[in-house]
Amino acid sequence: MEKNDFPQMFERAFVALVTERAAVRGYKKGEFAAMLWPWMKPKVAATRWNAIRDKAIPTGKPQSVTIADALRMADALGEDVGYLMVIAKENVRKSLSGADKKE
């Protein structure tokens, strides 16, 4: 990822925020994945969630988050997707402003 690739950083910050909030609510990874994609087999859903959170096996990069999946994540947490996006955006801005000060 480019040093200042804001959209990519935003997406990763959104995923990190969702992951953190799911953990705070006590959801296990597979349980949360099943909430996001209930029509999928649990193992398939868990693999997809892992690919979004970490890295996909074929590419070595995290899978991108679709708008539909972002809405599913927010709904599963009982939160507004716009609110989560604002928090993620601010987290990236803070990290970038902190990085600028360190250099």
PLM feature segments, named:
Residues 18, 32-33, 44-52, 84:
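Conserved hydrophobic/aromatic packing and binding residues within compact polymer-binding modules
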Residues 1-8, 75, 81-103:
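Short, charged recognition helix plus adjacent turn
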Residues 53-56, 69, 85-88:
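DNA major-groove recognition helix of helix-turn-helix
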Residues 37-65:
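Recognition helix of helix-turn-helix/homeodomain-like DNA-binding domains
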Residues 60-72, 100:
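Short Lys/Arg-enriched helix C-cap and helix-to-coil transition segments
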Residues 1-39:
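A short, Lys/Arg-rich alpha-helix, primarily the initiator
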